[in-house]
Amino acid sequence: MVRGSAKHEARRLRMAASLTELTTEAEKHGITVVMEEFDNLTAPYSRADELMWFMRHVPGLRCGFDTGNFLYNEEDAVKSFSLFRPYIASVHCKDRAFTENAGSPCVTVANRKLYPVAVGDGNLPIEKMMRVLLDSGYTGSFAAEHFGSIEQLKCMERSAAFLKRVLGEK
């Protein structure tokens, strides 16, 4: 679907209407609905500006901030983080590396390959983003994600150690 076309806009408006119904019902039950930027051009929320459109047009919708997805569209994760900070209700800590490994790469819109790595082992300033959130009083979750890794256990162990260190846990 071509962005900016009448068909694309109609689809986006239908999604916003459905999400508004969902967030309204969820709120009655104490549930927070989150949406994250998705690293695939078929989604009408794969870029920061598109996801922000939903944040601004769907009452009660919050951001599930995925640290690694903005690189797909060659967007700056830190700049996007600053933009979405007031909306963030949960964080997927997904690190990416430009160094080739055995994992399945995600290919960016600029045809660069991003490889899955343990949180803290890649090119993203995840610790910096976490500390800014924590310093602002954030009490939501930080989940490690290693989409495409063939070494899930190793990545999870390294990611857990990284997250515990940043969170000050033993």
Regions found by a protein language model. Name each.
Residues H8-R11, M15, S80, A118, ...:
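Residue-level preference for long, well-ordered alpha-helices that form the structural scaffold
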Residues P44-A48, M52, N69-Y138:
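Gly/Pro-rich active-site loop or hairpin
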